[in-house]
């Protein structure tokens, strides 16, 4: 396939046009008075959203050179979303401003490499300043404010704060669609996994079709159990120790005579046991069984560690205050494991999360962490139409990510003002000279853009507002929702510092790449077949 090339200034200008097309689409959504964007879908109803990354993902530009620029900014939005879960529009606006200011200087003869050096130094300084001014949050009211601001709905804020309160900061909060109106909070304490009983005969509560075991022993077995001879010695020990104590069996599978014997004993009322399959597959199953063992104070019975089912005693069994098993789920509440061991296991999983590159692995590790650390909260969301439901669900997910980011690194004043104050550390250009100093100045000028566009979307004169905010003290700023200046943190206009930092760092990283670009290579578009046949006066009857 033939390629076409573009060089120097032409190349950079084409990239800039692409950046502008994408950024101009996204920046109308920034701030409390931001507008919506409607995205056409080939199938189903159109999507209405004001979420930067959702819009960015949909934009493809016709001109192949410009498209490269648009895709680069898309990367900024996606990366910021992955790290902090919010701030995608801010990142896009910053990237556009950095590219615009930077290219002006490159066109005027500045060295791209030195500019990049200056930009990097400035971003590092601003990032450190933001962290230094951040305020840690642990109050429920602060959490509600962050979440409410991200979702643009104070009721959602309260709900997320409630959920965070219940599951702790490592807990899992998921969003599900419900077929009723409004929002509901569903909390599962303890460890839940998605495997239910192997036979409906195990049910103890006929009405709710669930088996509830109070204060049971818990047997955790890595392989299959099919022969009753393997299980009998242990069952006899359990009955001798305490005949009324139920037993939960978690194994790869329980089948054949082992299962039928357990069922018969349950029906006769001689012995109460429930068998469930182990959650997960392969290595993840091993890890999850290990988690359950740590939580309940038991041991995983596996031949590889020298434990055989027909030779073990009661010391390998775990315990819990209560276990509830339904057709699809098992929940273990208040496992009998030692809190030190559980804490050790939690730290081990946290270390794995730090070291993994795969998003999928990270997500699964976080699920395991949450199950050990506290519990799972499900927020059920309902709406009148499919379109509204999608939009609400999306807003909730964003708000949860923003809240996590806030709990992690703290908060700064929102509404774009934190950046305006933080770039004051760049006055004097960090002692740099020449083109490096110009790079620092580029960041200083670009950092006011998010605030400018928040003001513009509210129908005001952007640069007038930014220069006014720059004169105020730290923490003071402009509240676009009310049109007033004042202490933003007090009035609940706050941003997680992680969001603001990630937005600036990702925007700068793409902008400096773009400034140091000299050549673009794209595929030559295929000639349209149709044109060949549509007679240019040849062979048609005239």
UniProtKB/Swiss-Prot annotation:
Positions of ATP binding: 29-32, 86-90, 415, 479-481, 495
This protein's UniProt keywords: ATP-binding, Chaperone, Cytoplasm, Isomerase, Nucleotide-binding
Catalytic activity: ATP + H2O + a folded polypeptide = ADP + phosphate + an unfolded polypeptide
Entry-linked Pfam families: Cpn60_TCP1
Superkingdom of this protein's organism: Bacteria
GO biological process: one example: protein refolding
A GO-annotated cellular component: cytoplasm
Primary localization: cytoplasm
Function comment: Together with its co-chaperonin GroES, plays an essential role in assisting protein folding. The GroEL-GroES system forms a nano-cage that allows encapsulation of the non-native substrate proteins and provides a physical environment optimized to promote and accelerate protein folding.
Protein name (Swiss-Prot/TrEMBL): Chaperonin GroEL 1
């Amino acid at each position: 396939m033939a390629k076409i090339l573009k060089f120097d200034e032409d190349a950079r200008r084409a990239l800039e046009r692409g950046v502008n097309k994408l950024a101009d689409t996204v920046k109308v959504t920034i701030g409390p008075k931001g507008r919506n964007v409607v995205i056409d879908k080939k199938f189903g109803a159109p999507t209405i959203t004001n979420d930067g990354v959702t819009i960015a993902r949909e934009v493809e530009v016709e001109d192949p050179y410009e498209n490269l620029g648009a895709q680069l900014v898309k990367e900024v939005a996606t990366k910021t979303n992955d790290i902090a879960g919010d701030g995608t529009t801010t990142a896009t606006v910053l990237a556009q401003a950095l590219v615009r200011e930077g290219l002006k200087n490159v066109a005027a003869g500045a060295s791209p490499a030195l500019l990049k050096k200056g930009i990097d130094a400035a971003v590092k300084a601003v990032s450190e300043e933001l962290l230094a001014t951040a305020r840690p949050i642990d109050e429920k009211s602060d959490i509600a404010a962050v979440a409410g601001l991200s979702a643009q709905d104070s009721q959602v804020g309260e709900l997320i704060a409630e959920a965070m309160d219940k599951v702790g900061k490592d807990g899992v909060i998921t969003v599900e669609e419900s077929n009723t109106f409004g929002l509901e909070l569903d909390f599962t304490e303890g460890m839940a996994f998605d495997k239910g009983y192997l036979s409906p005969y195990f049910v103890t509560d006929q009405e709710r079709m669930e088996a509830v075991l109070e204060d049971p022993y818990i047997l955790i077995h890595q392989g299959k159990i099919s022969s009753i001879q393997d299980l009998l010695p242990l069952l006899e020990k359990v009955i001798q120790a305490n005949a009324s104590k139920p037993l939960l069996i978690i194994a790869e599978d329980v089948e054949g005579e082992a299962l039928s014997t357990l069922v018969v004993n349950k029906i006769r009322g001689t012995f109460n046991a429930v068998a469930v399959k182990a959650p997960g597959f392969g290595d993840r199953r091993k890890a999850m069984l290990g988690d359950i063992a740590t939580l309940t104070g038991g041991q995983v019975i596996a031949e590889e560690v020298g434990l055989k089912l027909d030779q073990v005693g009661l010391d390998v069994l775990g315990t819990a205050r209560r276990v509830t098993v339904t057709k699809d789920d098992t929940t273990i509440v208040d496992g009998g494991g030692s809190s030190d061991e559980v804490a050790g296991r939690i730290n081990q999983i946290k270390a794995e999360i730090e070291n993994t590159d795969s998003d999928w692995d990270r997500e699964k590790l976080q699920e395991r962490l949450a199950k050990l650390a506290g519990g799972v909260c499900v927020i059920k969301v309902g709406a009148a139409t499919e379109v509204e439901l999608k939009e609400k669900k999306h807003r909730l997910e964003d708000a949860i990510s923003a809240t996590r980011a806030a709990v992690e690194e703290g908060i700064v004043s929102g509404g774009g003002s934190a950046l305006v104050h933080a770039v004051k550390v760049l006055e004097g250009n960090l002692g740099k000279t020449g083109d490096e100093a110009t790079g620092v100045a580029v960041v200083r000028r670009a950092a006011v853009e998010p605030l400018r566009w928040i003001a513009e979307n509210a129908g005001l004169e952007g640069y007038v507002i930014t220069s006014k905010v720059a004169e105020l003290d730290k923490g003071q700023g402009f509240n676009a929702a009310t049109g007033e200046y004042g202490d933003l943190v007090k009035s609940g206009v706050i941003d997680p510092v992680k969001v603001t930092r990630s937005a600036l760092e990702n925007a700068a990283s793409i902008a400096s790449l773009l400034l140091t670009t000299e050549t673009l290579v794209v595929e030559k578009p295929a000639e349209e077949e149709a044109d060949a046949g549509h007679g240019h006066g040849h062979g048609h009857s005239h």
